Amino acid sequence: MDVGIVHGADHAYVKGEAGHALVKNERDLIDLIGFCGEHHADRVLLFAENLPEKFFDLSSGEAGMVLQKFANYRVKVAAVLPASLVRGKFGEFVCETNRGGQFRVFQSPDQAVQWLAAD
């Protein structure tokens, strides 16, 4: 699994490696959540390449399934995505999810890390 553990002052988070596929299917997602549990990390930093392409097509249901699994296990997720992916229906979805505290999309890793470190 191409991930690392980052320990902050109050929280640890799992960081996906930019440029590497990480979650290709539901089994990979469960493995990632299990890895979080093993390392006492309740947060995840992901990049576009870490997510399946279907994640960005809302009609596939993949985004809903992925985010619901993270929510069920109380894992907070920050995703660093290029602006080119955050458009259309997926862009509207991002606007809605960014209002909550479970999943947010950022254009810079620094912003994502700040959000993960908060609270």
Protein language model features and the residues they cover:
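Amphipathic, Lys/Arg-enriched alpha-helical "gate/interface" segment within cytosolic domains
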Residues: 2-119
